[in-house]
Amino acid sequence: MTSLNKCIGMMDEGIERTIQLIPQLPAVEAKLSRLMLMVSGSLNEELELELKPHKLNHSEFLTLMFLYSRPDSSSTPGELCEFTKQGATNMTRIGNALVKRGLITRGSSVDDRRRVVIRMTPAGKRLVLKMVPPLFPRLEAMFSGFSDTDKKNLGRLLRKLAHNLDQATGHPETNLGTMKATK
C-alpha cells in the first residue's frame, strides 16, 4: 500500500497540473479539502483495523461510544442516527447487531411508552473499557510533534470549517460563538 505522504505528494502534483487547465481553481481550498479527506480515510482504515478483532465496524463503535458517553448510557434511535450520520434503516441494522451481541438493549421510555430507548448493557461497557485504552498510544503518536497550541488551533479551525459547512449546506443552527474547543 502506498504511504499517505506519497499520496499527498501525488495529489499536490495533480492539483498543480489541474490549475494549468482550470486557472480559476481555488487550489489552496482544493488541496486542503482533499488533504482532509485523505487523512480522514486513513484514520478510518486504521480504526477499522483496530475494531476488527472485536468484530465491530466504525458505525457500531460510534454507537457504543455515544451511549457510553451519555450520563445514563442511553439514547434514542433518532439521536443515534444524527450522531453517527446513519439513516434509520442502517441504524436499525446496527442496533440489531449490537442487541444480538448483548451490548445494548431496546426498550420503551419510562416517560413515554411509545418512545424507544436504547441502553448500553454492562457487557457493552466492559467491551468499551477493554478496547478503548489500547487505542491511546496510536492516538498520541498521531499527534506527536504537535504542541498544545497546535492541537487547540487545529480543533478551532476544524470547528470553524464545520460551521461553514453547516452554513453552506443549509444547516445554520450551529452557533460558532458557542462551540467549545477541546484540548
What function would you assign to each model-found segment?
Residues 96-156:
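Charged, amphipathic alpha-helical coiled-coil/dimerization segments
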Residues 1-24, 149-183:
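C-terminal regulatory/oligomerization modules of transcriptional regulators
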Residues 27, 37, 41, 45-87, ...:
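N-terminal helix-turn-helix DNA-binding core of bacterial DNA-binding proteins
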Residues 77, 95-96:
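Short, hydrophobic-biased segments on the C-terminal half of alpha helices
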Residues 30-33, 37, 41, 85, ...:
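Short amphipathic alpha-helical segments with heptad-repeat character
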Residues 1-54:
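N-terminal leader segment of winged-helix/HTH proteins
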